[in-house]
C-alpha cells in the first residue's frame, strides 16, 4: 500500500507546488493576547485544504483509474445559525464510492443532509443550522478497487452578530483596566522562546512589553534558530545516483530521506527548470514508499539525457541520466512473397530503433502511400509494413526496405488466377434441321478458346459460329443434322499459365416429326375476293405439300403457296368457281383438311349510302320515325342498329325488322333526345356493311328575350330582342311580333311573314295610346312560346328638355328670408317645374331649397342667417330631363329693405 500526502502551511505568504498528484494549500492564522506575565493563546482559526491518496495496487489495468476529484470541496467560514454546503465531483474507473467524515472522529450530526445532485452530478454535504460544535475539518472520501482519494477541508463557525454586540456592550460598561506592569524575562534565550510562539506582526509589541529594545537583533537570532531547526529536520540516508539506460525504456531516480516535517516543500528539477509533472502527460511521475522518494521517467529518448535534481527545503541532490544510442539494424530479414492475382501482398520489417528516413522501393523506385500501396508503422515506430493491394502480374518484381544506409530486398511473385468455369457446357438435345447452342461462362475474360468435336478441332464457318464476349463463350451449330451429334469440348488458356482448362458436353440430334398445331378451317369467300387456307405446325423446319380433291397441286392457276416458318398458307388472290373443293396439307407424319366455298358478303348500294349521308331524316316531336335501308347479301346478315355509338335494343317505342332485302328501324312518339347519329351494321360470315344517317327530331324553338323599346314617336315604336337560347333542333327561321293595348287581352300580329333579325319598327299606332309588345320565334317545327311582354310605352313624339330660365332676380328680402322670381325658358319644351339651389358664402356645396320641383315662377327661401351672404341658381325640369342651371349674378345678404342690398 502506498500513501501520498500533500500539505502546505502558509503563515506569511502562499506558494504553489506542482506534482504528479494535485496541488494543495493549507492556510493558518493565529492571534495572541498578552495577559499579565503570560502569553495565552486566546483564539485560533485555520483554513485547511488537505489531500491524500492511499493506493491498494501499483499495477492498474488498462482503462481503469484511481479516484480523482474533478471539483474539490471548498473550505467554509460561516456564522452560527447559517448553513455550510460542501460539493464534490469525482471520476474514476471503477466508479468511486463517496462518504463524508469529520477529522475529529465525532459523527456528523443527524440533521446534516448527504445526497447526490443528479442534475449537476455533484456529491453534497449540507449542514444547517450551524453551531460552534460543527467547527472541524471534514473529509470527502472517494474509494474504488485501486485507491482511496481523501480531500479534507475546514469548516469554521464564527460567533453570531448578537453575541459580538453583547460583548462590546459589556466591554464598554466594565471599569477601567488597571495600568499594566512591565513584564520581565530572565534572559535573551527565554525571550526568543516567547517570540517563537507569537506572530511576526506582534514581535515589536511583545519586545516592548518585556523591555527588550534590540528588536532587530532578536529577529535575526530568531531566524537563525529556525533555520538550524529546519536544517536538522532533513536527513538524507541515500542520495540520488547517476543512471544509464537505453532509448524507449523507463528509468527511476530514487533517494531515501527522513523528514521531521512531512510537509516540507519538494521540487524535482531537470537542469535549471522545475519539472511540470502534472502537465507531462505521463512522461514524469513522482512516487513515495515510506522514506523512499522516486522520480519515474517513461519512454526515455535522447532528449531526456541530463542532470536531474531534487530540492528539499534548503538541500539539493543531483544525478545524471545518460541515454545510450543503439546502432540501427534490421531485426530479421524480408522474406519473398508469393500471391495470386487480386490478393494483397504484405512485406514487413522490424528495426532496432526508430528511423525517420525509412522508405519502401519497387524495382528501385520509391513508393508513396496511395490506393495501391498501404504503408504503415507500428505504435513503437519499429515495425514497418507495406501492403500491395489487388496484386497484378505487373506488380511482380523486387521490393526493398531502406533505412539510412541499410537495405533489405525481397521478391514478389504474382501468379495468375486459375481459370474456372462459372457455368459449364450443358448437354443439348435438338431436333433435326434446328440450331444447337453450347455456352459457358468463365471467371476471366482474358483467355484464348478452342472448340473440338470428338477430339477434332472445329473451324469457324457457315456450319459453326464461335462467339466470345467478356467472360461468356458459345458455339452455335446451324441446321443441325443427325451426323452433328457427338461430344463437344471447349479448351481455355491464358498467358503465363501453361495449364489447359476445359469443359465438355454431349449434343444429341433427334429426327424431326411434325404435328399440326393449328389446322385449316373451311373458307367461304365472295367471288373476286381474296381468300387463304392456313396450317400451323409445331416445327418450322418441316416441309409439306398441298392437295386439291386428293391430287397434289402442281399447276397453280390463281393460287400461291407460302411458307413462313411453321406457318404454311395456300392463298387465293381472287376467288372464282374453279377454286371450290376439298384441300389437304400433308407433312411428314401429319396432315390437315378443309373445304372452300363461294359466298357473298352483305352490301348496300352506294347511291343509298350517299343519300342517307347527305340528307338527315327529320321528324317532329311526338311523330313516328321510319328508317328503311335496302341491302344485298347471302346468307342473310345479322342486323344491328346503333345510336351515337350505343347499340339500339327493342323497347316500347322502338322496333326492328329484317327483310330479305332491307332493314327497318321504327321509333314512335319521338322526343328530342332521339336525335343523333344512327348506324346500321350488317354482318354475316363472309363480310359486313354499314350505313350512317342522322335522325333529327324537331320541336318549336324556346321563347325569345323580353323586347326592349328603343325609339318612340306618336305613330311608331321600335323594339329589339335576343334570340331564344333553345332553337328546338333547327335554325330559327324568323320572328312574329304581336302588340296589344295596355289592359287588353287581345294580341294582334304585326307581321304576316316571319321577321329576319331581332329588331322591328311597329307603325300605325294611335297617338297617346299605351301599348305592349311580344315576340314569337319560328323554326321548321313551327312557332314557339311567346316572350315576356315589353314594358308599356305611350305612342307620342319625344319631349325635349327645357331651356335656360330667364330673368332670375331678387324680389324681396328680410333678416331670415330672401324672395326670388323668374320667367319661363324661351327654348325647349315647357317645364313642369323648377329646381332652386343655394349656397352660403363660406361653402362651395349647392343644396336644393325644396325637396320637389317648384311649380310657379317665384319662391321665398326662409330660415336664413341674418346678414349672411347667399348665392342662388335655378334649373327648369320636365319629363325629358333637367335643363342647364342659371345663377344669380351676385350674392344676396339676408337683411330687410330699404333697397335690395347686393354686393
Swiss-Prot record:
Coiled coil: none annotated. Residues 703-798, 804-898 form the Fibronectin type-III domain. The keyword Repeat applies. InterPro entries: FN3_dom, FN3_sf, Ig-like_dom, Ig-like_dom_sf, Ig-like_fold, Ig_I-set, Ig_sub, Ig_sub2. Residues 67-158, 232-322, 418-508, 606-696 form the Ig-like domain. SMART domains: FN3 (SM00060), IG (SM00409), IGc2 (SM00408). Keywords: Immunoglobulin domain, Repeat. The keyword Repeat applies. This is Immunoglobulin superfamily member 22. It comes from Homo sapiens (Human). The lineage of its organism: Eukaryota, Metazoa, Chordata, Craniata, Vertebrata.
Amino acid at each position: 500500500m502506498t500513501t501520498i500526502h500533500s500539505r502546505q502551511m502558509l503563515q506569511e505568504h502562499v506558494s504553489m507546488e506542482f506534482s504528479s498528484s494535485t496541488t494543495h494549500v493549507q492556510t493558518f492564522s493565529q492571534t495572541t493576547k498578552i495577559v499579565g506575565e503570560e502569553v495565552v493563546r486566546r483564539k485560533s482559526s485555520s483554513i485547511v485544504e488537505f489531500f491524500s491518496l492511499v493506493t491498494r495496487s501499483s499495477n492498474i489495468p488498462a482503462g481503469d483509474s484511481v479516484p480523482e476529484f474533478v471539483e474539490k470541496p471548498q473550505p467554509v467560514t460561516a456564522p452560527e445559525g447559517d448553513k455550510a454546503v460542501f460539493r464534490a465531483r469525482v471520476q474514476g474507473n471503477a466508479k468511486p464510492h463517496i462518504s463524508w467524515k469529520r477529522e475529529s472522529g465525532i459523527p456528523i450530526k443527524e440533521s446534516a443532509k448527504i445526497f447526490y445532485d443528479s442534475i449537476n452530478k455533484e456529491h453534497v454535504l449540507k449542514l444547517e443550522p450551524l453551531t460552534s460544535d460543527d467547527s472541524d475539518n471534514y473529509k470527502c472520501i472517494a474509494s474504488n478497487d485501486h485507491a482511496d482519494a481523501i480531500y479534507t477541508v475546514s469548516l469554521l463557525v464564527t460567533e453570531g452578530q448578537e453575541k459580538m454586540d453583547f460583548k462590546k456592550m459589556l466591554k464598554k460598561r466594565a471599569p477601567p483596566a488597571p495600568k499594566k506592569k512591565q513584564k520581565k524575562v530572565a534572559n535573551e534565550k527565554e525571550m526568543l522562546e516567547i517570540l517563537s510562539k507569537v506572530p511576526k506582526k506582534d514581535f515589536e509589541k511583545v519586545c516592548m512589553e518585556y523591555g527588550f529594545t534590540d528588536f532587530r537583533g532578536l529577529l535575526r537570532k530568531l531566524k537563525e534558530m529556525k533555520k538550524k531547526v529546519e536544517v536538522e529536520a532533513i536527513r538524507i540516508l541515500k542520495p540520488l545516483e547517476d543512471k544509464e539506460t537505453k532509448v524507449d525504456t523507463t528509468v527511476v531516480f530514487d533517494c531515501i530521506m527522513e523528514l521531521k516535517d512531512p510537509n516540507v516543500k519538494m521540487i524535482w528539477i531537470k537542469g535549471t527548470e522545475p519539472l511540470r509533472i502534472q502537465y507531462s502527460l505521463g512522461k514524469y511521475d513522482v512516487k513515495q514508499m515510506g522514506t523512499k522518494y522516486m522520480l519515474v521517467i517513461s519512454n526515455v529518448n535522447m532528449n531526456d539525457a541530463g542532470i536531474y535534481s531534487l530540492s528539499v527545503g534548503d538541500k539539493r541532490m543531483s544525478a545524471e541520466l545518460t541515454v545510450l544510442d543503439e546502432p540501427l539494424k534490421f531485426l530479421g530479414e524480408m522474406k519473398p512473397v508469393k500471391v495470386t492475382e487480386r490478393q494483397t501482398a504484405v512485406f514487413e520489417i522490424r528495426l532496432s530503433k526508430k528511423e525517420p528516413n525509412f522508405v519502401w522501393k519497387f524495382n528501385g523506385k520509391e513508393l508513396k502511400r496511395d490506393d495501391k500501396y498501404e504503408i504503415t508503422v507500428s505504435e513503437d515506430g519499429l515495425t514497418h509494413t507495406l501492403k500491395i493491394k489487388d496484386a497484378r502480374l505487373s506488380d511482380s518484381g523486387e521490393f526493398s526496405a531502406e533505412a539510412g544506409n541499410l537495405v533489405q530486398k525481397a521478391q514478389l511473385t504474382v501468379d495468375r488466377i486459375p481459370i474456372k468455369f462459372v457455368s459449364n457446357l450443358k448437354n443439348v438435345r435438338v431436333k433435326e434441321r434446328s440450331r444447337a447452342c453450347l455456352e459457358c461462362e468463365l471467371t476471366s475474360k482474358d483467355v484464348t478458346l478452342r472448340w473440338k468435336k470428338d477430339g477434332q478441332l472445329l473451324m469457324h464457318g457457315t456450319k459453326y459460329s464461335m462467339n466470345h464476349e467478356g467472360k461468356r463463350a458459345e458455339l452455335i451449330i446451324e441446321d443441325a443434322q443427325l451426323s452433328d451429334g457427338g461430344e463437344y469440348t471447349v479448351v481455355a488458356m491464358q498467358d503465363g499459365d501453361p495449364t489447359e482448362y476445359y469443359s465438355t458436353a454431349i449434343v444429341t440430334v433427334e429426327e424431326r416429326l411434325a404435328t399440326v398445331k393449328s389446322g385449316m378451317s373451311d373458307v367461304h369467300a365472295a367471288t373476286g375476293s381474296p381468300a387463304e387456307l392456313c396450317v400451323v405446325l409445331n416445327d418450322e423446319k418441316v416441309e409439306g405439300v398441298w392437295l386439291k380433291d386428293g391430287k397434289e397441286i402442281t399447276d397453280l392457276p390463281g393460287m400461291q403457296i407460302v411458307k413462313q416458318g411453321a406457318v404454311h398458307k395456300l392463298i387465293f388472290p381472287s376467288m372464282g368457281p374453279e377454286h371450290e373443293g376439298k384441300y389437304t396439307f400433308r407433312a411428314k407424319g401429319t396432315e390437315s383438311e378443309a373445304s372452300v366455298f363461294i359466298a357473298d358478303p352483305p352490301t348496300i348500294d352506294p347511291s343509298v349510302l350517299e343519300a342517307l349521308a347527305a340528307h338527315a331524316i327529320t321528324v317532329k316531336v311526338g311523330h313516328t320515325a321510319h328508317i328503311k335501308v335496302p341491302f344485298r347479301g347471302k346468307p342473310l346478315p345479322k342486323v344491328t342498329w346503333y345510336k351515337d355509338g350505343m347499340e339500339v335494343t327493342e323497347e316500347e317505342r322502338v322496333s326492328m325488322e329484317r327483310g330479305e332485302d332491307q332493314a327497318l328501324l321504327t321509333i314512335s312518339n319521338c322526343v328530342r333526345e332521339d336525335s343523333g347519329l344512327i348506324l346500321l351494321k350488317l354482318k354475316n360470315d363472309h363480310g359486313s356493311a354499314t350505313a350512317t344517317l342522322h335522325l333529327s327530331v324537331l320541336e318549336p324553338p324556346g321563347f325569345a328575350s323580353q323586347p326592349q323599346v328603343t325609339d318612340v314617336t306618336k305613330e311608331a315604336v321600335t323594339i329589339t330582342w335576343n334570340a331564344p337560347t333553345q332553337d328546338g333542333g333547327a335554325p330559327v327561321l324568323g320572328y312574329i311580333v304581336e302588340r296589344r293595348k295596355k289592359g287588353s287581352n287581345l294580341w294582334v300580329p304585326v307581321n304576316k311573314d316571319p321577321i329576319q333579325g331581332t329588331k322591328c319598327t311597329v307603325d300605325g299606332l294611335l297617338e297617346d295610346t299605351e301599348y305592349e309588345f311580344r315576340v314569337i320565334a319560328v323554326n321548321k317545327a313551327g312557332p314557339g312560346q311567346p316572350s315576356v311582354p315589353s314594358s308599356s310605352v305611350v305612342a307620342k313624339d319625344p319631349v325635349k328638355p327645357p331651356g335656360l330660365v330667364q330673368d332670375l332676380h331678387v324680389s324681396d328680402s328680410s333678416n331670415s328670408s330672401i324672395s326670388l322670381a323668374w320667367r319661363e325658358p324661351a327654348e325647349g319644351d315647357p317645364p313642369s317645374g323648377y329646381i332652386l339651389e343655394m349656397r352660403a358664402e363660406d361653402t362651395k356645396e349647392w343644396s336644393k331649397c325644396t325637396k320637389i320641383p317648384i311649380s310657379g315662377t317665384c319662391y321665398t327661401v326662409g330660415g336664413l342667417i341674418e346678414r349672411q351672404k347667399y348665392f342662388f341658381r335655378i334649373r327648369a325640369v320636365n319629363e325629358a330631363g333637367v335643363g342647364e342651371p342659371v345663377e344669380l349674378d351676385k350674392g344676396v345678404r339676408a337683411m330687410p329693405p330699404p333697397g335690395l342690398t347686393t354686393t
